[in-house]
């Protein structure tokens, strides 16, 4: 017996897939998650048990997905093809498909297949097949033509036969059907001609397959409403020759013969099939389950909103498009027996308990028919357990690395870490890296002399970490005053607390120039706009800032007078950078970091006044550099933006103005900022006046044109 349970829609929003339905539904790396590809631009990852999407990815406007997205079970990544030739590979962390891995192929792709236990395969429209790894190694390799002219691929399936991958695809040419079977263990491609027999004028509308010990069972649903079965030998006697296959009728009139669309077929187990379609010409479309052994209808569910004629089957769930919604229909099938068919099979136990059958399935015992899916699954589990037992002594590389961290020397750890990072990344790679850093920091605290700086640098440069994955790393780097690691963390971590950001700023402003000179700092953000500064000049300038008081600049009026008397000298002084290039690169990392003003301001108040002044001078220098360009931007790679510079100037003044205003060397800077703000207000005011003038001129011009268009001349007659 079989039962169809109440179906449910995966989402409350209609699937934007058009009238033809989605391109496909494919299983993800987890049994409860599925990739749904619509016939437009979008791939959605759904979790069936929660009935909600976990992620969504779309190609650019103007591009179109041409084959269903699949999951690479070996890497956990997703693969899709758009515009027939462009292959994209991404994972859950990616957001924009336009920025993920891209490979443009030399031929049009029909389908990508991926199953557990082997690498994905790419089937081209001309019938050629390539493994994904070989194709990515040379995307523009020449693809041969396997099928003849005007042959079109109609259906394809990828499965494992005795642990070896087998691909089957069916083509059609002028009403004739051909079956190709590609076995990859022997590299043999077998071709068969499918003889339709009495139903030669009929069109095959749907295919489905199952695998037994000796044969591949190919079932087809024809336009006459009947289901036919064809047995394809797994080991053909003459694989190189074009052989013929004869169909035999399995079920009669399962759907209406007049149905031209909305028809599909799926094999559920050795005795049951699911059929999608209208059973009578005037009836609505239905989802029904048939018993092929006794040729009886087991259950049926009406679909009043119609369907697209697509049916997918995974585990105990059927997927189909009902109206505009992708719907999941759970089902249950019991093993067929004569007693069960006649209603005489006794069930003494509760319905939830699976009792041992009270009959013998002779076909399964003798191995003559198709092996049941459950028995094959148990055998696969048994074989897999044997394999797992045989490889159990092998310790994972991450576990070995964590053990090495606890006892070996720093040099040996660095070598082992380099080997580990060279291996293929797994889906949990970022958590493993976080565990490795936590292990290193734990040993650093236990052994004060142990500090593997190079190892920590390598781990941060993997670009998979965040502050929350290794919360103690930046605090430990602050203790060691390791500005190199702090700079990297500020550049890469998106979730650094404001207190840690301010602590980094204090270190960057207070560390000596001699220490920075011997430190390797990333200079990308300052290389194109920072003028080289002589050591003598910088020492003199630093000394001036540290002395903190100059009698010549005792009062504010004299500063303003000097600004009026010597504008050129003031300009020269402002355009010289107040910090060394390496310190500037560190400060730029702070400018790029994310923050919230509410949480940042209290910590900025703890920065010493002299350091705040130095930072303000550097920010003002950056603003002047921006003003030199018409675009108001700094040259180079990842320089600070004008908005970042202005925001930090405002933040520093809000937090420290009452303290900074009391420092003598800050007077000229504050006056310069005052003059700058005043000039900006003046410029804005003048621009507003110009805008008003232009509007008035435009208004007068419009009135003049209107008078010319609608003027009437009056002539006085005597």
UniProtKB/Swiss-Prot annotation:
Gene Ontology cellular component terms for the protein in this record: nucleolus; t-UTP complex
Underlying gene: NOL11
Origin: domain of life: Eukaryota
Complex and partners: Interacts with UTP4. Interacts with FBL/fibrillarin in a transcription-dependent manner. May associate with the proposed t-UTP subcomplex of the SSU processome containing at least UTP4, WDR43, HEATR1, UTP15, WDR75.
Chain positions with N6-methyllysine modification: 346
One BP term from GO: positive regulation of transcription of nucleolar large rRNA by RNA polymerase I
Cited InterPro entries: NOL11 (IPR042859), Nol11_C (IPR048897), NOL11_N (IPR012584), WD40_repeat_dom_sf (IPR036322)
Subcellular location: Nucleus, Nucleolus
Function according to Swiss-Prot or TrEMBL: Ribosome biogenesis factor. May be required for both optimal rDNA transcription and small subunit (SSU) pre-rRNA processing at sites A', A0, 1 and 2b.
Record's keyword terms, sorted: Activator, Methylation, Nucleus, Ribosome biogenesis, rRNA processing, Transcription, Transcription regulation
Name of the protein this chain belongs to: Nucleolar protein 11
Organism: Bos taurus
